[in-house]
C-alpha cells in the first residue's frame, strides 16, 4: 500500500495544475448543454429534463475520462514516462491503479457540480444514496479505463483522432440526450453494447430515480472495465 500511495502522490504532483481545469471544463460543458439544448428543443417536459440532466453529467465524464485523458497519457508515453514507471520496483498493477485513482479524484468534483447544476436548472428529483454514488464511481471508472486503454494501445496521432471521435459520437449521435426510441433498432443494439448508453441509463435510474435499474447495463460496464484493464496491463507487463 505504501508503494501505491507514493505512486498516487507522484501522479498528483505531476498533474495537480490540471485538476482545476478539469472541473472548469466539466462545469462549462454542463452549463452549455443544460442551457443550450433547451434553445434548440423548445419546451422541456419532465422526460426531456431528466435526459438533459443525466446526459450533461455523462458528457462531462466522457470529455475528461476519454477525450482529455487519452492525449495526456499518450503524451506521457511518448515522453518516456510510462517506460520509466515500468522500470520502478513496483507491481505493474499498482501503476494502473494509481493512475486510475488520480484521474478519479480529478474528475469527481466536476461530476458532482454537474449533478447539482442539473438539479437547479430543471428541478429534477435526485436520489442521494450509496447506490447512486457507486454508479457514479463505476461510470467514471469505465470512461477513464477506456481512455487509458486507447492511450496505451495506439499511437499519439490515432489517440487524438479516437478521443475526438468518441466525444462526437457521445454528444451528437448516441441516445444520451434524447430517448433511444428515436433511433432505428439496429443502431440501438449497437449502442447498447458500447459503454455510453448503458452508463446514462444507470445514471438516470440510480441518481435521478427515472427508469428501471438494468442488470444488463451494469454487466456491460463491468465487461468494458475488465477488457480495458486487460489491455492496459498487457502493455504495462509487455517487455520491450
What feature does the model see in each segment?
Residues 1-9, 176-217:
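Short hydrophobic, aromatic-rich alpha-helical segments embedded in or entering the lipid bilayer
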Residues 11-12, 36-40, 120, 207, ...:
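Junction motif at the cytosolic side of a transmembrane helix
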Residues 17-43, 50-66, 166-171, 219-228:
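Hydrophobic alpha-helical transmembrane segments of multi-pass membrane transport/permease proteins
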Residues 18-22, 54-55, 62-67, 97-102, ...:
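Short alpha-helical transmembrane interface motifs in multi-pass membrane proteins
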Residues 29, 49-118, 165, 171:
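Hydrophobic alpha-helical transmembrane segments of multi-pass membrane transport proteins
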Residues 37, 41, 151-193, 197:
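Transmembrane helix segments
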Residues 42, 75, 115, 119, ...:
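Transmembrane helix-loop junction
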Residues 92, 98-161, 211-222, 226-230:
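Alpha-helical transmembrane segments and their short interhelical loops
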Amino acid at each position: 500500500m505504501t508503494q501505491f500511495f507514493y505512486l498516487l502522490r507522484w501522479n498528483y504532483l505531476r498533474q495537480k495544475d490540471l485538476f482545476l481545469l478539469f472541473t472548469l471544463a466539466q462545469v462549462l460543458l454542463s452549463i452549455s448543454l443544460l442551457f443550450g439544448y433547451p434553445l434548440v428543443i423548445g419546451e422541456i417536459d419532465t422526460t426531456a429534463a431528466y435526459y438533459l440532466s443525466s446526459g450533461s453529467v455523462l458528457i462531462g465524464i466522457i470529455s475528461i475520462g476519454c477525450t482529455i485523458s487519452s492525449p495526456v497519457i499518450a503524451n506521457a508515453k511518448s515522453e518516456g514516462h510510462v517506460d520509466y514507471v515500468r522500470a520502478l520496483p513496483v507491481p505493474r498493477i499498482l501503476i494502473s491503479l494509481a493512475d486510475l485513482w488520480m484521474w478519479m479524484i480529478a474528475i469527481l468534483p466536476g461530476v458532482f457540480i454537474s449533478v447539482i447544476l442539473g438539479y437547479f436548472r430543471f428541478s429534477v428529483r435526485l436520489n442521494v444514496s450509496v447506490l447512486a454514488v457507486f454508479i457514479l464511481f463505476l461510470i467514471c471508472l469505465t470512461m477513464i479505463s477506456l481512455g487509458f486503454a486507447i492511450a496505451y494501445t495506439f499511437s499519439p496521432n490515432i489517440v487524438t483522432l479516437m478521443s475526438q471521435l468518441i466525444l462526437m459520437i457521445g454528444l451528437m449521435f448516441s441516445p444520451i440526450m434524447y430517448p433511444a426510441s428515436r433511433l432505428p433498432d439496429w443502431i440501438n443494439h449497437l449502442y447498447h453494447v458500447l459503454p455510453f448508453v448503458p452508463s446514462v441509463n444507470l445514471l438516470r435510474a440510480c441518481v435521478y430515480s427515472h427508469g428501471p435499474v438494468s442488470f444488463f447495463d451494469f454487466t456491460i460496464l463491468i465487461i468494458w472495465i475488465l477488457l480495458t484493464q486487460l489491455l492496459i496491463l498487457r502493455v504495462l507487463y509487455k517487455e520491450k
